[in-house]
Amino acid sequence: MQNYNSYSEITPELLALSKLSREHGQIDPALYTKYEVKRGLRDLNGKGVLAGLTDISEITSYIIEDSDMIPCDGRLYYRGYKIQDLVTGFEKENRYGFEEVAYLLLFGQLPDKQALENFQQLLGEYRSLPTHFVRDIIMKAPSKDMMNALARSVLTMYAYDDRADDTSIENVVRQSIQLISLFPLISVYAYHAYNHYHDGASLIIHPPKPELSTAEHLLYLLRPDGQYTELEAKMLDLGLVLHMEHGGGNNSTFTTHVVSSSGTDTYSAIAAALGSLKGPKHGGANVKVVKMFDDLK
């Protein structure tokens, strides 16, 4: 039986097998051009590969002049609304915008006051993990990577859902809203678990507060004393809004298209998307930014 401590070891036998894999796993790069095979989601001319159609969001970062791509100031639209107009709207009324924009992206129209309040209440009601989930799933095998922790937790949520395989619009909407509510909990709890077990930090698990906005709730869960300023919450809220959607052609969204097209359940599709987002050429690139700043220090 293999010793657990050597689980990650690269043995001489594995090195030999890897050599064979390299020798017999090569394809002539010229064949990709010959047969017009797209290597990833970027074409040879630098444009994104058209992989589908969406009216959920749109992003423009260049214009075409005489067949040349000319960079321009970026423009981001959610359901036809300029992101600047959306932000101006909720900032002018001193509101948090994440919930409002989530409603817009999900349902295609901006909510009125009552619809927004109902949606916020629904998000708050779903802000609760199953009994012993934190202890059994998050605490017992803390991951050093938040995307890994999220993907594993999302897959496990399947076991708690009596309608996990129901792909009707009504059920997928329910599952989606629940996951939106639970992602902050899972992410922060996993972060605290890792810091506790691997870095020796104190373990602090705050109970959820359904009355807080998503941005406020994240900061409350993250801070040992649960305290944050309004400016911090508003800045985080703005960051969440800007990162919600960007055109539908990115790697993790494409992964969701591919996986969900088989008719699989919501949890499997989202876990696959999180696996894509974890990669260093996608969302995982943010980790390199942190490492760069650490190196500068």
Residue map of PLM features:
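Hydrophobic alpha-helical bundle cores within soluble ligand-binding/oligomerization subdomains
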Residues: 2-297
